[in-house]
Amino acid sequence: MTNPVVAIVGRPNVGKSTIFNRIVGERISIVEDVPGVTRDRIYSSAEWLNHKFYLIDTGGIDIGDEPLLVQIRQQAEIAIDEADVIIFMVNGRDGVTAADEEVAKILHRSNKPVVLAVNKIDNPEMRDLIYDFYALGFGDPYPISGSHGTGLGDLLDAVARHFPKRGQEEYEEDVIKFCLIGRPNVGKSSLVNAILGEERVIVSDIAGTTRDAVDTTFVREGQEYVIIDTAGMRKRGKIYESTEKYSVLRALKAIERSDVVLVVLNAEEGIIEQDKKIAGYAHEAGRGVIIVVNKWDAIEKDDKTLIEFERKIRDHFPFLDYAPIIFVSAKTKQRLHKLLPLVRMVSENHAMRVQTNVLNEVIMDAVAMNPTPTHNGRRLKIYYMTQVAVKPPTFVVFVNDPELMHFSYERFLENRIRDAFGFEGTPIKIIARPRK
């Protein structure tokens, strides 16, 4: 089950972005630790009392030169489409405006839970201003102050009460779940159709967090697979065309529910910055990754074309150096027969466990080959390493002082682990801890 989505909706200048930043806090910059990966500020992950959720700020959308009420209406409709819970924000100092009433009408039709937040109630004397807003028909309004941060706890408590209860896992453990992500026109839908071929497709309406997330289940060579959110690849209404950023949110939710992510590139168009961002989402999420170059039939080739394209990919995505690359054509079916075996291999690597004694033989050999670094006259000592998790494989290495573990030495250890055990297609995490 994915984390729920909360959208902040309201007319311009009611303080949506301020509240967004208040709720998100410091988390907005965390994602920028990954080299070459930046994230649009329109949405972020957030947490309140152990409830993790995505927060989207509809005010971050620029819908162009449309009249103001049309823009507000479009933003509200996008939020309704994507969100599990909606924070409807109004400005307490302005009273109820015609634009507020317009948004309220749309939200009433949505059947989504709505929590009404009255912003700019900056001191207790102003609380009486909230009573006019009962007329909007959303029950008790919550007084908040974006500038002071007051009232947010009560507001988030009310929001969290509407979160769906966490159920059991949607699919059996041995089912391989994968998704295809990529910018528009890279051929995701045609790839899905080519993978499925003429087989009878069992479309199961598994409730994701959106009403229209449809997963496609099929069996190939005795292995059950699920392509996550095939509906998301086909759904492109007018609003989505004008607000491309929202397809990112759908991709994030699909990634979260997948074991393996296929990052799809368009061979004809080459690699652009947006591809890098999209690939970064899969890497950050710790999923298995395969880079799929589609439309390979459409470009003129000589004996160097494939090698040069592969080098370009490695240059653009240094953080995905573990991901295999496959060149395919959904149209001519070129190399498509190799895709599912690759998905299966990466899924197995993503869930692989290594015995502690075998792992430590590799680590001790690595240290003998390349002694540990020193800092200010102190040398890093490695006592032992153990694997603590899978999906992705996560290792804890016990040392005398974690501060002495330089990232380049950590990288060296990761490469030795990969040389010994494979792990193609999956990120590896190494955490240095002091020995108690």
From Swiss-Prot:
Keyword rRNA processing found: no
GO BP, sorted A to Z: ribosome biogenesis
Segments forming domain EngA-type G: 4-167, 176-351
Sites where the protein binds GTP 1: 10-17, 57-61, 119-122
Any GO MF annotation of the entry: GTP binding
Residues reported to bind GTP 2: 182-189, 229-233, 294-297
Cited SUPFAM superfamilies: P-loop containing nucleoside triphosphate hydrolases (SSF52540)
The keyword GTP-binding is annotated on this UniProt entry: yes
Segments forming domain KH-like: 352-436
UniProt-listed Pfam families: KH_dom-like, MMR_HSR1
Transmembrane segments: none
Assigned keywords, A-Z: GTP-binding, Nucleotide-binding, Repeat, Ribosome biogenesis
Quaternary context: Associates with the 50S ribosomal subunit.
Family recorded in the similarity comment: Belongs to the TRAFAC class TrmE-Era-EngA-EngB-Septin-like GTPase superfamily. EngA (Der) GTPase family.
Role noted for this protein: GTPase that plays an essential role in the late steps of ribosome biogenesis.
UniProt protein name: GTPase Der
Organism: Geobacillus sp. (strain WCH70)
